[in-house]
Amino acid sequence: MEAHQFIKAPGITTAIEQAALAAANSALANAVVVRPFLSHQQIEILINLMQPRQLVFRPEVFWNHPIQRVIHNELELYCRARSGRCLEIGAHPRSINDNPNVVHRCFLRPAGRDVQRWYTAPTRGPAANCRRSALRGLPAADRTYCFDGFSGCNFPAETGIALYSLHDMSPSDVAEAMFRHGMTRLYAALHLPPEVLLPPGTYRTASYLLIHDGRRVVVTYEGDTSAGYNHDVSNLRSWIRTTKVTGDHPLVIERVRAIGCHFVLLLTAAPEPSPMPYVPYPRSTEVYVRSIFGPGGTPSLFPTSCSTKSTFHAVPAHIWDRLMLFGATLDDQAFCCSRLMTYLRGISYKVTVGTLVANEGWNASEDALTAVITAAYLTICHQRYLRTQAISKGMRRLEREHAQKFITRLYSWLFEKSGRDYIPGRQLEFYAQCRRWLSAGFHLDPRVLVFDESAPCHCRTAIRKAVSKFCCFMKWLGQECTCFLQPAEGVVGDQGHDNEAYEGSDVDPAESAISDISGSYVVPGTALQPLYQALDLPAEIVARAGRLTATVKVSQVDGRIDCETLLGNKTFRTSFVDGAVLETNGPERHNLSFDASQSTMAAGPFSLTYAASAAGLEVRYVAAGLDHRAVFAPGVSPRSAPGEVTAFCSALYRFNREAQRLSLTGNFWFHPEGLLGPFAPFSPGHVWESANPFCGESTLYTRTWSEVDAVPSPAQPDLGFTSEPSIPSRAATPTPAAPLPPPAPDPSPTLSAPARGEPAPGATARAPAITHQTARHRRLLFTYPDGSKVFAGSLFESTCTWLVNASNVDHRPGGGLCHAFYQRYPASFDAASFVMRDGAAAYTLTPRPIIHAVAPDYRLEHNPKRLEAAYRETCSRLGTAAYPLLGTGIYQVPIGPSFDAWERNHRPGDELYLPELAARWFEANRPTCPTLTITEDVARTANLAIELDSATDVGRACAGCRVTPGVVQYQFTAGVPGSGKSRSITQADVDVVVVPTRELRNAWRRRGFAAFTPHTAARVTQGRRVVIDEAPSLPPHLLLLHMQRAATVHLLGDPNQIPAIDFEHAGLVPAIRPDLAPTSWWHVTHRCPADVCELIRGAYPMIQTTSRVLRSLFWGEPAVGQKLVFTQAAKAANPGSVTVHEAQGATYTETTIIATADARGLIQSSRAHAIVALTRHTEKCVIIDAPGLLREVGISDAIVNNFFLAGGEIGHQRPSVIPRGNPDANVDTLAAFPPSCQISAFHQLAEELGHRPAPVAAVLPPCPELEQGLLYLPQELTTCDSVVTFELTDIVHCRMAAPSQRKAVLSTLVGRYGRRTKLYNASHSDVRDSLARFIPAIGPVQVTTCELYELVEAMVEKGQDGSAVLELDLCSRDVSRITFFQKDCNKFTTGETIAHGKVGQGISAWSKTFCALFGPWFRAIEKAILALLPQGVFYGDAFDDTVFSAAVAAAKASMVFENDFSEFDSTQNNFSLGLECAIMEECGMPQWLIRLYHLIRSAWILQAPKESLRGFWKKHSGEPGTLLWNTVWNMAVITHCYDFRDLQVAAFKGDDSIVLCSEYRQSPGAAVLIAGCGLKLKVDFRPIGLYAGVVVAPGLGALPDVVRFAGRLTEKNWGPGPERAEQLRLAVSDFLRKLTNVAQMCVDVVSRVYGVSPGLVHNLIGMLQAVADGKAHFTESVKPVLDLTNSILCRVE
């Protein structure tokens, strides 16, 4: 066997590529999302700093400090995920509301920039109290925060976090503060740039600018728009150098995360800190080079900028390394300063070759270049000197050693020491130097700095004083402060130092052993009763949990606890890890804080500790007011009754859903194993393992019981809680998605107790905090346009977020409704629990959101303003509210004023509940017209607009007018243009008419009406009957003014036409534009001609016209009538014209629309302008559209011109739509098929069809030889080696091809349309005579505007606007182009799926111009053929499925004749094309149109995206009339080649055909036609056949083909987005609808025709049921593509 080094192993290559793809997907899935807008330089900085993390840029916000904030957010996530419930130091005000896990926050009184931060802090939630205290100097309102600072606060907390808030504290100060808090761990994020270790100066790096004046350091990052960060230098230096604090408060400081010079420090209290050296900047990209002369002195008495020049300069490390390598390796004669300068200049330029950066470059200042050249030259000179001296002294030493005698060598061997510590070379020290010598070096490399200093805490007073005095003495001597307690600064160590803390480990490797609690424990619910009470669970759940006992198997491995809970017949799994996300029933998030070393867990207000004891597992629970211990014995408990477990799960789910609906912040979502487990109430990673393998996700209690109404059953006992949920009957409700288990009977004794939530006789029954849903008896009375509703019934049946109580001034329990609230929610009257007050109203969230509103007492005084305020004070909330009629009870407020006050002061979606007396009043006074509610905000904005408007000359008449909040009733008559809305108004019905323009005013006045423009009408509309014409186009503030001032108001207008325009661009018009609901719609126009109606039908689907003018739009003619333009500039350029806005509402006999280029944006953004322009004329409209603006919005004459050019006529035809009905479920056999497992169904299908999982995703078959035509190839045939799919199963039942591959497109072009065509020259008369058995002589066909309308309608449904239809110019490529596409669907097969050797299928798309030219003719011919078809012959899909099935069922004694064409399109030639042209001529199509069709079909060019084929004769699927002519050719071949006896039914669709007959034979002339055209027919004659996706069974009918449908589902890609899964569900649902009445019959027939077992079909139907229920499971697979293509041979014909 020969092996070669260049042979590639495909398997290994594929595995490597898949691994690389998986790595890339994993990196993207865990990428950091960068939200701010960044410059190119900022992006490069972030990418370099965040390596190796993957970044995803989604710019959507502007930040002042984008680079720092991205780093800050990343480090903040790390700190908060590990800290759990903690104390936070110096929190940013905007982060307070987002982090509920913080138990206390330490602030300082705001000064400077902090004041600005507090002003922009949120004014809601916990941040509001902090903001108020900070800005007003008030003391803290509660214990959650303080302003004493971290050093002055003593709030106890075990863990803390400090995000960039410790820069002004030393490590010693932090250690003492942590001791006062009792804190053991503190996560601190700090910004520690290395430049603070250098002397004062200005340092500029690639990322930031740092100014160091000796005391303070200011850092400003690249691209910042505000001031930089200002910190104390000494503190930053101490944080960099210190790794431990010694003394009475010892600490260990670890660097657990680092991004650039941003660090997360973990400060841990440790009794004996050990040495922990670390390298702070191992990835530093700068080297700091010293300037020998320094920055220079001060040139005068006054300081200048030169004093800020740097002693050191930041130089890119790659520049310094390359410069030193170049200089050190130069020849002695070549080494000089000028050569170094030349080289430095060369490497300082950035060089890019394509996308490869060959040289990064360096943009340096003159000072930096001078310092670098000087330092490099002197350093290299010193190194060369050392090299020379080392060689010289070494040679002399070698000569002396080799000259030694025997005695000298013996002496050295006997007396000189050697051992383990001996290192070669250590015995020689030719050169020694001092730190301050010039030869000690000119640069500082941060990459090799190592620090391990200790800082004594301030309690060591005597030692600190001695050290201070010694340091001062050393400074007096002119020396550096080298304290003997600390190592020297900047110790240089190896560059690969392994710092475990720096790499990210926050676990001490020497931690104490963790106790193992693994085992099986018995957890009875009775042992956790105190915890349930602390959790505020309803009595029902507590009682049910007390009767259950669970077995919990605990497994503890590597700081992780896995629990398996066995509860009855259910198994739950949970995994406890630090930082795990706990499921909640609200927006608030909770993360589990789990410390295995301390055996503690905490989240929210709950915490627990556990330990293994002799009696079992001992757990201590701590919560609000609870300190409870429980011991769980080892062993296995008896299994609880399944019915009890099911009832417990259902009650628990109802409680969770009720709490989720009522809670604003949310609490834990309680799972069964979370309440019956040793670590209650936590249940992270909840998983339910069902014992039934055919059960899907819907069998979980979280889905199943949501569909069950929790109504107490009177037949079952009630122990003070809601009884078992009753299952609705099948006849009353739809069939559930999965079968539900019947509820088990309650084994407890029967007691007589009142239902939950109802008062017992002689006692007050108090409902729990969260009530359960009961049966509703409310009645809907009215719905407002904003979604608000009025009900008759009980307020407590509402599902709104808030309930409003009619309270008293003191908010104490009272009578009436207030007493009912106290009965249900007594805790809501606790004043200490009020979260907010607004006026007299009080808001509380305990035990649910309730607003106590106070109405005035009308027994003492009538106070309408107080009544308005009572409702208005309840609107300061989020969510909806349910109201009573405030004050209408004891306070004797009349119903009418209270109801009107609610109408004016409520929010959208609110509900009002009326008692019976008020409900009868409402029904007697029900609004008969739509109402417009003017809220305070709308009124305020409208008044502002009126005030601005009254300052102009036009609006002076509106001065002093006001809009007040209230409710206005109106009548709105809307209609299509020209429907006669204005003509319907008579003078007796109106006093004043308000119109938007002077033209309309004059037209109304000519009719005798008192008409005014909106501004002048302000003087006359008060108390009058007002009609407002073109109401939507009036300025909304004037519209509201007139509607409110009028006695009655009648609006006229068209919502689809031009609305009011905000000419001032102040934003007031869209803010107050009212939402008007038409009371009546008029759809008949008396103005618009027929062609205009068709153009605007998209906006007016029901428009009809009485006009006799059929065509009124003309292009390219001289201007006539009134000129209409779109802009004021066009109006100035065309005298006598008016703008479209001014012409709105007017009618002209003839118009001319002039579209100018400056109106492009107006027309594209507002189609209403085009509608108004088109609907102003009655007879003729000339369009002058030089820029083509109207063509861009679909208004063109090309379609109409081509239609009349082809011989179309104006007239009427029957529509081509076939009426279809939906059969009723009279025999619902589908209901007997339960959902089944998807996996088992597809595996059974694979077993019975013999298909196996394919190792490849697709096959590129060998490309055949090009036999005719000319093929144009792309330069590159790049293909994808693999395909990613989301599939239902890994076994595909279709021919596997790769439609998206370039080689597949070539194979299809050559294999299907490049094959040689067999020409057949013969007369068509014989074939036409045979075809007459199915299609008799047609005769002349009339093509009318009905076919044109159907063509346009089809284009609109596909999202086309007609702009692609051009004038018929055969020289234009856009007119004659034929586009080729590869079909993205493969054929279902029961045979081989891979080795089929078939090329793909293609589809062509003719130009829209040709489709519009031939389309109406082909539609008319198709209608003529359908009218002539004999009885029992079915064409295409132009029939109702039930009719076809009935015809098949009637042919009981027939067999099924099937014919399958092979290469149906490829075998069509000049003969089939000639037959088509003969039928066209027979129908009366113009000769030039027939010859054009023959020309296009006989010689064509298929244009693929990157390939093209010039060929002849072949037919392509996708051209206009494809179904028509394919079906006609199919009919002609079958009827000419075969004779049938007792023909009962014949159906033809494309290349599919069946004939139901008793027997058949081949006709005498068949061989000639088959041989002449090269036809390939595959005939089958059997009892049951297949046709167009259905199974044809004579005597039974046409049944859906379940096997084929399920098999085709396996081939498609159903991802990656959810919209594909929804398309699958809808398609399967439509298919199952066909099986409603024939499911069982389908099982028997389909199994017989495919030769499979009936169980397979039964299983497939169940699988489809599961998919239709939304339970489809998808598997992502990455499979290679098998490429079998060879070279393509081209030959020019």
Swiss-Prot record:
Effect recorded for residue 671 to A: Complete loss of increase in thermal stability in the presence of zinc
Keyword Cell membrane: no
Keyword Ubl conjugation: no
Region (RNA-directed RNA polymerase): 1207-1693
Protein name (record): Non-structural polyprotein pORF1
Coiled-coil annotated residue ranges, if any: none
Function: Methyltransferase: Displays a capping enzyme activity. This function is necessary since all viral RNAs are synthesized in the cytoplasm, and host capping enzymes are restricted to the nucleus. The enzymatic reaction involves a covalent link between 7-methyl-GMP and the methyltransferase, whereas eukaryotic capping enzymes form a covalent complex only with GMP. Methyltransferase catalyzes transfer of a methyl group from S-adenosylmethionine to GTP and GDP to yield m(7)GTP or m(7)GDP. GDP is a better substrate than GTP. Y-domain: Indispensable for virus replication.
Ranges for region Disordered: 712-771
